[in-house]
Amino acid sequence: MDYDSYQHYFYDYDCGEDFYRSTAPSEDIWKKFELVPSPPTSPPWGLGPGAGDPAPGIGPPEPWPGGCTGDEAESRGHSKGWGRNYASIIRRDCMWSGFSARERLERAVSDRLAPGAPRGNPPKASAAPDCTPSLEAGNPAPAAPCPLGEPKTQACSGSESPSDSENEEIDVVTVEKRQSLGIRKPVTITVRADPLDPCMKHFHISIHQQQHNYAARFPPESCSQEEASERGPQEEVLERDAAGEKEDEEDEEIVSPPPVESEAAQSCHPKPVSSDTEDVTKRKNHNFLERKRRNDLRSRFLALRDQVPTLASCSKAPKVVILSKALEYLQALVGAEKRMATEKRQLRCRQQQLQKRIAYLTGY
C-alpha cells in the first residue's frame, strides 16, 4: 500500500482555508482515518525504566503499512502501535467518537468559558473510558508543544498532546480571534483516541455565535454570566456616580434660595397659549372654511338646475342628474348655434345677390 498515493483521500492539504468552517465530527467521519504522523515526543518503549509491553492485547509491533520509511523518527512512531488488532481499535474509536463528540465539545466549551477558570491554563477533561485502553509510559518526556515548523498537523489542530502519557486527554486550545468580529470565539479540539495508534484523529469545530452550527448546541449560560460579571463592576460604578450626583443636586436644591426675581418676571409676561387651544382654533377655522365651500357648491348646483328647462320644476334633483341634463342641454345649444351660423351665411349670400340684381336693374 503506497502512502503517498492515498494521502489525498485522508488529509486536506489546505487547512488554513478550511480552519473556520463549522464541520461536525459525525458529518466528516473520514477525518478519523487521516494518516498524519505524530511527532516522536516520547522515548522508545524499551529505554525508559519499567518499560514493558505496550498493551496487554497487542503483539509485537509491525512496520507501518505505508511508504513513509525514510524518516527514522516517524518510522519508530509508526511501528509502535500498529498491531494485529488495529482494525478493532479504529472501529471502536469511530463508534464511540460519533456518539460522544457533542458531549466532549459542550464540556470543553463550558470549561473554557467558565468565569472562574484561569485563562493561562486551559482545562483538560478526561476522555471516555471506552474509547482508549489505559497506558503507562515508562519515562514520559516533559510536555512541550509542537514547533511552528511542523507541517499539516500544526495547521489543522493548533496543538497536539505533547507526550503519550497525555494521550487520554483532550487539549482545548484557544485560536487567535479575528479582528473583524470580536464575538466569534473559535475553539479547536484535538483528540487522540488510541495512544498506540499513530493515526492522529483530528477534527476542528469553530464555534461562533453568529454562525449556526447544527452539530453543537448553544454555549451554556456561563458565557452570559461571564459578560454579566465583566459588566457588573462598571455598572456598579456608574450607578454609584449617578447616585452621588443625585444627592449633590438634592443638596443644591435645598440650599439654594427660591428664585424670586424669575417668578416676578413670569407673572408680568402672559402665559403662552397651550397646544390644546391652538388645536381648537385651527379646527374651528377649518370647519368654517369647509362649511363655506359646501354652501358655495350647493348654490352653484341650484343655479345650474334653474338654467336647465327640464329640471326647473324638480327641486330635489340629485347632482348627477343635474350634471347630465346640463350637458345634454349644452350640446343642444351648441348644435343650434352652428345651425344658425350656417343659416346666417346663406342669408348674407342671398342678400349680396339681391343687391347686385337691384344695381343692375337701376342701371337701365
UniProtKB/Swiss-Prot annotation:
Principal localisation: nucleus
Short name of one Pfam family: Myc_N
GO terms, biological process: regulation of inner ear auditory receptor cell differentiation; regulation of transcription by RNA polymerase II
Gene3D superfamilies: Helix-loop-helix DNA-binding domain (4.10.280.10)
GO molecular function: DNA binding; DNA-binding transcription factor activity, RNA polymerase II-specific; protein dimerization activity; RNA polymerase II cis-regulatory region sequence-specific DNA binding
GO cellular component: chromatin; chromosome; nucleoplasm
Record domain bHLH: where: 281-333
Comp. bias regions, Basic and acidic residues: 228-245
Keywords of this entry: DNA-binding, Nucleus
Region described as Leucine-zipper: spans on this chain: 333-361
Region of interest: Disordered: 41-81, 111-172, 219-285
Keyword Nucleus tagged: yes
Highest rank taxon of the organism: Eukaryota
CDD domains cross-referenced by the UniProt entry: bHLHzip_L-Myc
Cellular localization per UniProt: Nucleus
Subunit relationships: Efficient DNA binding requires dimerization with another bHLH protein. Binds DNA as a heterodimer with MAX.
Protein name (database record): Protein L-Myc
Gene: MYCL
